[in-house]
Regions:
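Short, well-ordered alpha-helices that flank and scaffold nucleotide-derived cofactor binding pockets
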Residues: 74, 95, 99, 165, ...
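PRPP/pyrophosphate-binding module of the type I phosphoribosyltransferase fold
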Residues: 130-203, 207, 213, 256
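Active-site phosphate/pyrophosphate- and oxyanion-stabilizing loops and adjacent acidic/basic residues
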Residues: 70, 95, 208
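N-terminal segments that mediate ammonia production and transfer
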Residues: 1-90, 98-139, 147, 233-238, ...
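Conserved small/polar residues in nucleotide/adenosyl-binding loops
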Residues: 247-254
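Gly/Ser/Thr-rich loops at beta-strand to alpha-helix junctions
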Residues: 87-93, 156-158
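Short acidic/polar active-site loop segments enriched in Thr and Asp
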Residues: 81, 173, 217
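A conserved beta-strand->alpha-helix junction
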Residues: 105-116, 213-231
Length: 257
């Protein structure tokens, strides 16, 4: 909905599932010609994709992400000096975490806004270079601090491992990684670029193994229940929109290879 602000339009409401909205004789009208279906929104819109100032189900994406950070703080008991976001995707969650814990929030990483998203780049080499180009450590903030590093999600681990090393190289005493969403263990066939299960770190490693892989002092993901609480959604909404057969999964992985 942030696009409406740019062009000076007024946001009235969201178009509902299966709804047709049209204008007739300068009057806004709506019909629902299809049988009602259970709402099954893409959770990644709330976690990552939507711009923070866009509205989803009556709240901004920013509000949801702050909620995720606060829920994660409720589930955590680590002691640290500072909460640092992975900019810009982790900003809202890190702020929610810091406010809930009563910890200092600071910008330990400075982002170059002329570099795009790294986890959706096509090759590992390009993704690794993208992290170095996109983020630079703010040494005056980081040095000699026990840091809680908050990000919105962990997909391949590309960004997290590079950032953890960057923080330690800049003098951080400890780096505790906190992810404001649950583990991503399965591919999505509706737009998220996670082609195969083998590319998803959480599909192939335990939390302890991922922590060792990214070289963090500790690692924690938001629980599924924490995600539901942060969204204000019923847990029964979490089924995939349609069944995906094992044959389809295997064919998809073969094509990706």
């Amino acid at each position: 909905t942030c696009a409406f602000d740019i062009i000076g339009a007024k946001f009235v409401r969201e178009v509902e599932n299966g709804e047709i909205v049209y204008i007739e004789n300068d009057e806004l009208k709506s019909i629902k010609p299809f049988p009602p279906k259970k709402v099954r929104p893409c959770v990644f819109e709330f976690i990552y994709f939507s711009r923070p100032d866009s509205i989803l189900n009556g709240k901004t994406a920013y509000e949801y992400r702050k909620n995720f950070g606060a829920q994660l703080a409720d589930e955590d008991n680590i002691d640290a000096d500072l909460v640092v976001p992975v900019p810009d995707s982790g900003n809202a969650a890190a702020l929610g975490y810091a406010e809930k814990k009563g910890l200092k929030f600071d910008l330990g990483l400075i982002r170059n806004h002329y570099v795009g998203r790294t986890f959706i780049e096509p090759s590992q080499q390009i993704r690794s270079l993208g992290v170095k180009l996109k983020l630079n450590p703010n040494i005056s903030v980081i040095k000699d601090k026990r840091i809680i590093l908050v990000d919105d999600s962990l997909v391949r681990g590309t960004t997290s491992s590079k950032i953890v090393k960057m923080l330690y190289d800049s003098g951080a005493k400890e780096v505790h990684v906190r992810i404001a969403s649950p583990e991503i263990k399965f591919p999505d066939f509706y737009g998220v670029d996670t082609p195969t299960k083998k590319e998803l770190l959480a599909a192939n490693k335990s939390t302890d193994e991922i922590c060792e892989f990214i070289k963090a002092k500790s690692l924690k993901f938001l629980s599924l229940n924490g995600l539901y609480l942060g969204m204000g959604f019923d847990k029964r909404n979490d089924n995939y929109p349609q069944s995906v057969s094992y044959t389809h999964l295997r064919a998809h992985e073969t094509r990706s290879d």
